Amino acid sequence: MSQISLTFPDGNARDYPAGVTAAEVAASIAPSLAKNAISASLDGQHIDLQWPIAASGRIAINTMKDSEPALELIRHDLAHIMARAVQELWPDVKVTIGPVRDQGWFYDFDRAEPFTPEDLGAIEQRMKQIIAARDPVRTEVWDRDRARAHYEAQGEPFKIELLDRIPEGEPIRMYWHGDWQDLCRGPHLQHTGQVPADAFKLTHVAGAYWLGDASRPMLQRIYGVAFRNRDDLKAHLTMLEEAAKRDHRKLGREMELFHFQEEAPGMVFWHPNGWSIYRELEAYMRRRLIRADYKEIKTPQVVDRILWEKSGHWEAYRENMFIVEVDEEGAKEKRINALKPMNCPCHVQVYNQGLKSYRDLPLRLAEFGSCHRYEPSGSMHGLMRVRGFVQDDAHIFCTEDQIEAECAGFIGLLSSVYKDLGFEKFDIKLSTRPDVRVGSDEIWDKAEAALKGAIEHLDLPYEVNPGDGAFYGPKLDFKLTDAIGREWQCGTFQCDFNLPQRLEAEYVGEDGAKHMPVMLHRAVLGSFERFIGILIENYSGKLPLWLAPRQVVVASIVSGADDYVHEVVAALRAAGLRAEADTRNEKINYKVREHSVGKVPVIMAVGLKEVEERSVSIRRLDRQGSESHGLESAIATLRAEATPPDLR
């Protein structure tokens, strides 16, 4: 039998017979490791302990102490355990797919009756019984005919369709959890008892089309969350409760910010209060871009398919594009256009107007670009996922030698913006070259080194995601952390060696010859809509004074103060503050309560005493009591507080 060499994390290597399993490798190191092992990582691929290893490579044995591999396995096994529990409780239910996702998993089921909260409780109880039984988990590789015959006998049409989608030559792997079996790539734990029974929870049910296709059957998707221990689960459920209180859709109604309706699914109807936040954020970003030497442009929203074909987007993204057919006068055929799903091809058109010199680079073109992408109706979620959105988009055209400086400048801008907006912490992930890519190894080496160099020069921590870059260049992803610990991927910095070539972007180099520029895609916020949703939830609607749509409400205590109320509002507006009057015939406590629900940061109560003294009684949101100030002093204080952070 041939031998293979396996290298361990400490650099030591051992020879094993080809076909050795990870379990046997663990046993060869120490009995305790074999006992605690749950999976292995082979050349970066997560495998289970039963898989035969055919070739030499780098191996690490994972235990429950290795949080990421452990959580992935726990959640993956729970998806199977849940599907088994459902079919044991309701044998007529058909199973489909059940992937791991952030904090948990989901599984889609075909069932005539809707799952109820009581059903979820019954499923959880059955899952705990399966875990307590410590049923063994095993795997086999089947041929296609055997697998098809099995699923035809079981009456599982969705599994047959999945089977047909597996490419010829790829192994068809079946996993058993006890007597229940599923088609799965793995990996999995060794027995159901390795799943912590007190650290998971089924959270909710939602509708989902089969394979995300609205023309296919509507299924029921059961979601679950899972962690390594009970305390982590409890902390997560507490966070979910807090997140529900902060839900931007609920706060959007209370604060009268925006709404959606069936006549324009996934498109935002901004109300005056919400549009105020949008415009304030846009003005802030525009000032930051001007200061960083970006040139703002505006490009068309409706563009002929010819450009999308040249850029490659027609082939890759056509299903997600809104197509517009136009009868041109005198033309034999309709002209086919598309609402732009992204801005980059149009930005290259602006760059291409006039021959550029190396002295013109870097050229930074920015646009608050309106884009449209078709998203399945089931995937839309308030402002967080919409069909029509505006990106704080910019593209930098530069030489290869300028990538690092441009990257460092962008990270500095992003860091400053996030801090101004209340996000002190963000993480960086560097995704490097995939196997299939465009561009020479030399330019990939240079670009990856430039991105690493920029991050390290700024002394920032980062993770490397090997092989996860786009086919056209390496990228950085930036995840900010909000007030309740959730991560949101917003910022991006992406090198592109492909689009400038496809759209024939050039510049004249110092040598007098024509060269292709590198195109850097970058965004700080991502989209205004989603980022405003994040801001609302981060602040629980209690936005900083400079962003608050209604900064001050001046409320009368008695009708005799109405004239003074309007005088105060006029003075506040003259000072640049967003102020409103409330002279309704209601008690002051009622007015304060109503405006507090609307998250107005400052409420000025005005009665006869304030009229006489030309003062105001100021109540701050979420603070007890009130303070009396002279009118001019109060206006000066609020004006300073309401100044945007970049202008202070």
UniProtKB/Swiss-Prot annotation:
Comment on bound cofactor: Binds 1 zinc ion per subunit.
Listed GO MF terms: ATP binding; metal ion binding; threonine-tRNA ligase activity; tRNA binding
Domain TGS residue range list: 1-63
Reaction equations catalysed: tRNA(Thr) + L-threonine + ATP = L-threonyl-tRNA(Thr) + AMP + diphosphate + H(+)
GO biological process, alphabetically ordered: threonyl-tRNA aminoacylation
Residues covered by region (Catalytic): 247-544
SMART domains membership: tRNA_SAD (SM00863)
GO annotations of cellular component type: cytosol
Domain of life: Bacteria
UniProt keyword list: Aminoacyl-tRNA synthetase, ATP-binding, Cytoplasm, Ligase, Metal-binding, Nucleotide-binding, Protein biosynthesis, RNA-binding, tRNA-binding, Zinc
Cofactor(s) essential for the protein: Zn(2+)
Subcellular compartments: Cytoplasm
Enzyme Commission identifier(s): 6.1.1.3
Residues bound to Zn(2+): C344, H395, H521
UniProt record similarity statement: Belongs to the class-II aminoacyl-tRNA synthetase family.
Annotated function: Catalyzes the attachment of threonine to tRNA(Thr) in a two-step reaction: L-threonine is first activated by ATP to form Thr-AMP and then transferred to the acceptor end of tRNA(Thr). Also edits incorrectly charged L-seryl-tRNA(Thr).
Assembly and binders: Homodimer.
NCBIfam families, A to Z: thrS
Protein name: Threonine--tRNA ligase
UniProt organism field: Paracoccus denitrificans (strain Pd 1222)
Gene (name only): thrS
